Amino acid sequence: VSVKLVDGKNGIITANDVLANIQAPLDWLPKTSLVCLENTHNKGGGACYELDNLKEIRKVCIQNNLKLHIDGARIWNALVAKKYSPFDIGQQCDSISVCFSKGLGAPVGSAIIGDFSFIKKARRVRKAFGGGMRQVGILGAACIYAIDNNLQKLELDHQHANEIANCLWEKDWVKSILPVETNMIIFEVDEQKTSVLQILDLLKEKNILAVQFGPKQIRLVFHLDIKPEMIPILKSKMDEIIISKQ
């Protein structure tokens, strides 16, 4: 298996990007057979694919006999942000993986979706690697509950992310912020004034947990357990972070 990474804007690629990266049919080159997209894109700050873009990529895949898979661990956020239906996205790909625990708040659970022959092959591969669980109905019930009850709550997570991003823009220790489309904020720390580790420590002192996301960036993710009444508190705690240049 050979993998070819494609640079995109905040992780989002286009049909032209796919075309430009299809290998020539030469004996000494790996054959291009699969296109994988991530929607929403984690390192792109939760960026979403537009439906028209997906349709164009799908068209290129069909014309070049390529399969299209979507890593949809956070697909629910994309559906809510863009107001698409699951069918809008599902019709554009051969397979898609989804997660029920990230945004939807189920305790555990992911699924892979495809046609009958694909799922049959996936089950065979899972078994070959020792995978499989018994009596998982109770976990499945939690996933169904999450879809039925928590899907529309994702919009609130998106609102919270935008609100805190606006707050962060006012901080002199923030150099830049990726565009906020869903429930994530990825911001770059101004290293002329402070460091990622110092900001993480100061946030932790105020019971705000964040993660380092590369050498200069920090990621914040908003989820089901962050309530509206917590946002003003979060803002005030961030306002308390004052960096004194040594």
Model segments located where?
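Conserved PLP-enzyme active-site core in the AAT-like
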Residues: 1-193, 197-201, 206, 211-217, ...
